[in-house]
Amino acid sequence: MLYIITPCSRPHNLQRIYQSMNFTKVDRWYIVYDTSKGRDYTFKYANHDKIIEMKHDEEGVCGHPQINRALDEIDENSDAFVYVLDDDNIIHYMFWILLPTLDSNYIYTWDQNRADKARFLKGGVIQKGRIDTAQFIVPRKYIGSIRWNPTERQADGQFIVDIHAKHHALFKYIPEIACFFNYLLAGSGA
């Protein structure tokens, strides 16, 4: 099983993200709209049986409270993989190739294709500032009560570090590029 979480304050990107999805392999795509600061959004996929749209008005940075809201919706004992996909990114084709090979008794990281001068970020280094949320997939049962810090910009790295501290023996690094970084912001230059 696969649950994808997208915190959303850029709904204009959702159609492009949708096009990168393989819904035969997705059980649920949680789109959590950031309605803090008086913002409001119209649901786009109300009739899609695999998409759950919700609004969450807790203030924070980078959609972190919205990610936490979706995590709270998923049974904490579930073997389902959780993957966070930011609303400025799409799913890399290699992700769909790797997904069926993953075992829900493990946590996985992989490499990332970036459009900047660094170009590639290796997923084998579990340190804040050295790993991005798109490089990481985890069964919900290993997240437990760990959550993203709502006000910290690099909360994704800290979230991964916290899970690694608790379950380091379960981490497996796949030396393949299986994700992008800010693909939609980079003008698809990745």
Feature annotation, model-predicted:
Residues 162-180:
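Catalytic donor-sugar/metal-binding loop of nucleotide-sugar-dependent glycosyltransferases
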Residues 92-161:
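Conserved catalytic core of nucleotide-sugar-dependent glycosyltransferases
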Residues 115, 134-135, 174-190:
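Active-site donor/metal-binding and catalytic loop motifs
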Residues 79-90:
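Short beta-strand-to-loop acidic/aromatic patch adjacent to the donor-nucleotide binding site
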Residues 1-6, 21, 27-31:
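Hydrophobic targeting segments
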Residues 10-23:
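Short, well-formed alpha-helical segments that are part of the catalytic scaffolds
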Residues 37-78:
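Active-site-proximal specificity loops/subdomain of glycosyltransferases
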Residues 21, 33-37, 87:
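Conserved short acidic donor-positioning loop in nucleotide-sugar-dependent glycosyltransferases
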